[in-house]
Amino acid sequence: MENLEKMGVKVFEVDMDSVDEIANASIGVDCVVSTLAGLGDVIIDLQKRVLDGAIKAGVPRFISSDFSSDYNDLVPGENRNFDLRREFKKYIDSTSIKATSVFNGAFADILQYNTPILNLKDKSIGYWGDKADWELDFTTMDDTAAFTAEVALDDNAPRDLQIASFQISPNMILADVKEANESRF
């Protein structure tokens, strides 16, 4: 917090269960950026309180805690995390605030943590069905932060912003791994 304060950022300690405290901390703000992570008690319940506080304070714009793949056209019920975001989206879209969702695909840093898409430990690359050539969106944290900052400053920001630092398919990942690593995948 000290580094933020040195840069001129005003830091407020608030009770996140209190819409009134959130509202008081949001007075005079042009945009609230929600960067929450969690399950229903966070993505829906807590984020609703943050949104309600922003609305009570007269904040005109809100960026929700999406920062994920675009779930709008995905089948409800297939992914819990997308379903939580979809439920919050219904709520925010029923309010008067101008909302933006940033859809950045996956954060690029997951490629270094032995996830199903790239598991260096098990020497495996995963994909669904016949999707080995399907290019996935990945965005770095820095790019996500930069685009989010731009949206926060833009009165005409779109409802949904799609971004990606790069797109890569499982077959492209395999080719890159083979080139960089002599072991077999």
Q: Which sequence ranges carry the predicted segments?
A:
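Cofactor-binding loops of NAD(P)H-dependent oxidoreductases
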Residues: 14
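N-terminal Rossmann-like NAD(P) cofactor-binding module of classical short-chain dehydrogenase/reductase
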Residues: 26-35, 63
